[in-house]
């Protein structure tokens, strides 16, 4: 990511709370895709769409001093780069600590981080998996730095949720740092076909790659035990171009490589275009031929030969899909390890 300040988050790009509340915020995916339009007095000629970063700036300005003390931290605070599968970055639930207007802003920020096609599906997943803790309202947020200074990041966390909104403040990191998503659609222990799971389509696409491999290639790709889940260390980058787990892309034909690219497209599909484009740019910069893809037979739910656990790893990226007993997905993509 570029380290330059985000123009939408500087003074002229901050929509006021009153102006924000004049816009319609709905739960539909179409609304998630529809940008908030700033009045001409704020946006200037040819009013431009407000991004999630702009709403973060509006939210920041609307916080009381007591709220800032609880959820705002220096930009370099270590919590900013943490990721886990079920955690709260602060002990302040959205539904209890923020007023209704602020809750609406937080929801809009979250929706805006995702693509129009998947925003509502992803929101529903967080709402479902956070059910016992209050659904989406049971998540928590933190803001690091200050919008408009060139160094800030908004982080939202909960069960099966770590997302970031950084306005390009975190240089060389897709999504502003490591992210996590997951789903336990029909219970903690999902059936082999993971019915209703929001992200299982990604594993089905990955299994198309395995089906296209010949016997020798499968020997390279199919391994025993996958990596453990260890919080932020789960997606620790190695910087290695060779001898990573699984089959290197150099061992694949052009058609097989095209299938891997389709997997990458599906992995990035739930996220807003700016983030997915940047992620792919960083991966390509480090060399697609340095990627390795691995499948893990010891965590095959239902023993059906459809691999529930797999990963793609390169010198400065890890995308780890763990579908046993339900879906956990960890991702970390940088310019360099």
What is each PLM-predicted segment?
Residues 1-19, 34-35:
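N-terminal secretory signal peptides
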Residues 33-38, 210:
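Short intrinsically disordered, low-complexity segments
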Residues 37-45:
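Signal peptide processing junction and immediate N-terminal pro/mature segment
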Residues 46-65, 69-337:
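A cross-kingdom marker for long, charged
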Residues 27, 38, 230:
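N-terminal domain-start interaction segment
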Residues 24-32:
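Sec-dependent signal peptide hydrophobic core
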């Amino acid at each position: 990511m570029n380290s330059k300040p985000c123009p939408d988050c500087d003074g002229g790009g901050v929509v006021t709370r009153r102006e924000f509340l004049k816009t319609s915020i709905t739960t539909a995916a179409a609304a998630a895709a529809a940008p908030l339009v700033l009045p001409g007095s704020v946006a200037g000629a040819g009013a431009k769409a407000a991004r999630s970063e702009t709403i973060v700036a509006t939210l920041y300005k609307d916080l009381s001093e007591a709220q800032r003390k609880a959820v705002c931290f220096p930009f370099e605070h270590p919590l900013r780069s943490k990721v886990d599968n079920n955690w709260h970055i602060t002990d302040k639930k959205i539904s209890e600590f923020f007023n209704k207007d602020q809750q609406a802003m937080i929801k809009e920020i979250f929706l805006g981080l995702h693509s129009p096609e998947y925003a509502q599906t992803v929101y529903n997943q967080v709402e479902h998996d956070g059910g016992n803790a209050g659904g989406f309202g049971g998540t928590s947020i933190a803001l690091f730095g200050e919008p408009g200074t060139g160094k800030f990041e908004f982080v939202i966390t909960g069960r099966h949720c770590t997302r970031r909104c950084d306005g390009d403040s975190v240089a060389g990191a897709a999504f502003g740092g490591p992210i996590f998503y997951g789903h336990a659609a029909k219970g903690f222990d999902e059936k082999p076909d993971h019915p209703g799971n929001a992200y299982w389509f990604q594993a089905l696409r990955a299994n198309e790659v395995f089906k296209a491999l010949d016997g020798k290639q499968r020997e390279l790709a199919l391994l025993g035990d996958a990596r453990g889940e260890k919080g932020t260390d789960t997606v620790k980058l190695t910087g290695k171009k060779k001898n990573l787990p699984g089959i290197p892309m150099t061992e694949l034909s052009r058609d097989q490589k095209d299938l891997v690219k389709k997997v990458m497209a599906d992995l990035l599909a739930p996220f807003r275009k700016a983030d997915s484009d940047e992620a792919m740019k960083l991966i390509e910069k480090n060399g697609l031929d340095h990627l390795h893809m691995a499948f893990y037979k010891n965590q095959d739910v239902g023993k059906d030969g459809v691999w529930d656990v797999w990963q793609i790893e390169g010198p400065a990226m890890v995308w780890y899909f763990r579908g046993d007993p339900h879906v956990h997905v960890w991702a970390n993509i940088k310019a360099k390890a």
